[in-house]
Amino acid sequence: RQIRFLSDFHYPQNTKLNAFDLSVIMNNALNNCMENVSGDDPYISISSFRKNSIFMITIKNSFGGQLNFGDSDLPETTKSGREHGMGLNNIRRVARMYMGDISLEQGNEEVILSIMMQVE
């Protein structure tokens, strides 16, 4: 299957952001995107920017389904396995290490994951 991949990602230089921590975020987010991307023109988009001490990452993917949030602000997984469904929790854990958090939105047949961290 062909998936368009768009990137405007810039790693913030001279900050306290650990490359391993960023890899946890990117690996989990991209795995989620690859598992769930759908639509007639499937795409994954990654962008980032830094403003003062704040580093923002936005990851979008086309998605024609419906997320089920249940009692949480994170969607419930429908897949089985002890480790399945831990990706967003791992992303949130890392963001909170940097006094940040994540948000997840769905609309216009896409899912948008936003990650905010303080990197100074």
Q: Where on the chain are the PLM-derived regions?
A:
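Glycine-rich ATP-binding loops of the HATPase_c
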Residues: 99-109
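Glycine-rich nucleotide-binding loop
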Residues: 54, 65, 107-114
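Conserved short strand/loop->alpha-helix "switch" segment adjacent to the catalytic nucleotide/phosphoryl-transfer site
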Residues: 6-25, 82
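Glycine-rich/acidic phosphate-handling loop/turn and adjacent ATP-lid/helix
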Residues: 55-85
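Short beta-strand/loop element within the Bergerat-fold HATPase_c
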Residues: 43-53
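Conserved polar catalytic motif of the HATPase_c/GHKL fold
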Residues: 24-32
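A short, flexible helix-to-loop-to-beta junction within the catalytic ATP-binding CA
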Residues: 33-41
